[in-house]
Regions:
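Alpha/beta enzyme core
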Residues: 10, 15-63, 74-87, 96-206, ...
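Extreme N-terminal starter segment of soluble prokaryotic enzymes
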Residues: 4-9
Length: 223
């Protein structure tokens, strides 16, 4: 059971730019792993239930992850899982849900977060990104993965094409594309809460995670 009965809190771990990415400078993968493990310990000390590993600093990124990014994310994810087996571990390889699932399955992570995109299409700074639910389903079947897939609905940093209501998009992701759970994020605290209420009404039994925007000032209200 991944979630606690009352509330489960995750912290994002976003390593320094990985070798091969545009913003990478001098750090080796060993340097980056050491930084990540130090950050993970801080997260544990502050009482979080889990972490989501994301290579956010590798921007700009198209949809298909580079081979080196997949390799380095696998190394980092393995080190977290090995050193902190009690932590819930999610994997998010920007912006490639197929790569995320491959990494997560290899290191026995607890779930995958698919952001940009699981269903539909989004306009982003890197162009139009298209849903990967078909490819993800095929990989799950092919490798017989049991890693749950959690999908972002209407990702906040892109513009969804088609204008589908948030609750309809959520229903589609679960019942037509077979996401195990959802991430929901608005551009403000108020929008996030409004979106979550709409999704929860449509999908009362589906796990829903607030995907971002929490800080020291609003975390109590969001919880």
């Amino acid at each position: 059971m991944m979630f606690k009965p009352d509330c489960t809190a995750f912290a994002m771990i976003q390593p320094s730019a990985l070798p091969g990415s545009y913003r990478h400078e001098d750090k080796t993968i060993d340097d980056i792993v050491a930084e990540v493990l130090e950050e993970t310990q801080m997260i544990v000390d502050n009482g979080f239930d889990g972490v989501i590993l994301q290579n956010m600093n590798d921007m700009p990124i198209k949809q298909n992850a580079a081979p080196e990014a997949i390799a380095y994310m696998t190394r980092i994810a393995y080190e977290i899982k090995h050193q902190y087996p009690q932590l819930i571990l999610g994997v998010l390889v920007n912006w490639d849900g197929v790569a995320s699932l491959a990494v997560a399955d290899a290191v026995h992570a607890d779930f995958v977060r698919v952001e940009h995109l699981f269903t539909g299409a989004n306009v982003t700074s890197a162009g139009i990104l298209e849903g990967q639910c078909v490819e993800i389903a095929a990989l799950r079947k092919r490798i017989r993965s049991k890693v749950p897939v959690y999908a972002d609905i209407q990702e906040v940093h892109g513009i969804p094409l088609g204008g589908k209501p948030i609750d309809d998009a959520a229903w589609e992701a679960v019942h037509e594309a077979f996401a195990d759970g959802l991430f929901v994020s608005g551009k403000s605290k108020e929008e996030s809460l409004e979106m979550i209420h709409a999704v929860r009404k449509k999908l009362p039994d589906t796990p829903v995670i607030l995907g971002g925007g929490a800080n020291g000032e609003n975390i109590e209200e969001l919880l």
